[in-house]
Amino acid sequence: MQDTNTGSEAAANQEAASSLEEKRDDMKWVVQFNIALNEDAKRYYGFWNSVFKFAVLVFGSYSFASLFVGASMAYSIVAVIVSAISAGQLVFDFKDRQVRAKIQHERYSKALTALDSAKNINELELVQAKIDDIGCDDIDTSDICDALAVNVAIDRMGLDPTRKVDIGCFKRLTRYIIPWARPEYKS
């Protein structure tokens, strides 16, 4: 009878260990994915998005100024001032994006270390709560949903693009991330 109990206990322990590792693996996938996506969105999408906005702004301001150059120089001066202020705002936004990405990267890296150190499900859930708090309000969904950034992140990290991990703020984001990341959507 004791051998049966011992065997059942061993099986339960083995199942608990497997569940722990599976949950740890899922959570690490989420963190690794977001580290890669955060970095590539910053590098590829964020930069070219700012360049495109700036180009449109300059062209629009020039066209606007040209319309009124004959009527009044005041309009041209206003257009130039507005263009300069807007360009400064674009630069500020880009720098702010870089800073936020760096902070998130550091926090996600610490989360990976914490995941490796967790010894049981309860400790993993504590780490999960911290992961859920990392930049959920700061995540720019236009970056997250950008197919180029997602595909680059998936490829560079060698991650399985079909996995869905629904934890915290990523529960609502995976609906956007995963479909765009699947191979059949790649150009």
Which residue ranges define each predicted feature?
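Conserved non-transmembrane functional hotspots
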Residues: Q2-V58, A71-A74, G88-S187
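Generic alpha-helical secondary structure signal
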Residues: F33, A79-S83
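Hydrophobic, membrane-inserted alpha-helices
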Residues: V56-F64, V82-S86
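Membrane-interfacial hairpin junctions
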Residues: F64-S76
